[in-house]
Curated annotation (Swiss-Prot):
Domain of life of the source: Bacteria
PANTHER family (alphabetical): PEROXIDE STRESS RESISTANCE PROTEIN YAAA (PTHR30283:SF4), PEROXIDE STRESS RESPONSE PROTEIN YAAA (PTHR30283)
Gene Ontology CC annotations of this record: cytosol
Organism from which the protein derives: Streptococcus pyogenes serotype M12 (strain MGAS2096)
Name used for this protein in its record: UPF0246 protein MGAS2096_Spy1821
Protein family per UniProt: Belongs to the UPF0246 family.
Pfam families referenced in this protein's UniProt entry, alphabetically: H2O2_YaaD
Lineage, opening ranks: Bacteria, Bacillati, Bacillota, Bacilli, Lactobacillales
Biological processes, Gene Ontology terms: response to hydroperoxide
Amino acid sequence: MLTFLIPTAKEMVIPKESYPHLLPQPSQAILKAMAAMTTEDLAKSYRIKEEAAKKEQQRWQDMASQQSLAYPAYQLFNGLMYRHIKRDKLTTQEQAYLTQQVYITSSFYGIIPANHPIAEHRHDFHTRIKIEGQSLKSYWRPCYNQFAKEHPQVISLLSSEFDDVFSKDCKQLWISPKFMAEKEGRFKTHSTISKKARGAFLTACMENNCQTVDSLKSLVFAGFYYHPDLSTDHEFVYIKKEA
């Protein structure tokens, strides 16, 4: 069985379905540290204006006082990649695939199933904060490595900020898809192409119930197709031809 890892997103939209917010134990220390920060501290930590930091401070205070609601993560996050993932009108098989084989890597919650209930928050591995004297990456590394050991065959749709959260020896069987546009024999890639393609790729995997590495090579989605000559055992390259 394939396991997919996807990142979080800054952009969020509130779904209709909500739950009580239950925070995993490792996240408690992060919440305590974030809730204790002033608006000025948060502005520096996030590298945002104080006006925007006030909104984030209120979110942390609400979580600390157990006033926050929680929402299925894959529905709450609404960044470009998420908007290209099929999230509505799923078949029973697609719903099972999304909730059992797709995991979200979070600097606040750890690695969680795609449908895990989470609260509105802003947090990533670039957030300037120490937890128990450690960087966020060092703090989470044991949990992340344990997940990797339990799920050796991972399809990583993660961005570069996660490269050194996992130890290298945990990623020996990982495959990272790469998405490129071809025009007049030249190949290019950028974040917009990649984010849209990640969502379309995951949707194609769900719809085709891909369970083996070889099945990924036959996928065709949003104009992309597998390119064997540019691919390696650990990097599958998908090309889309532009007019």
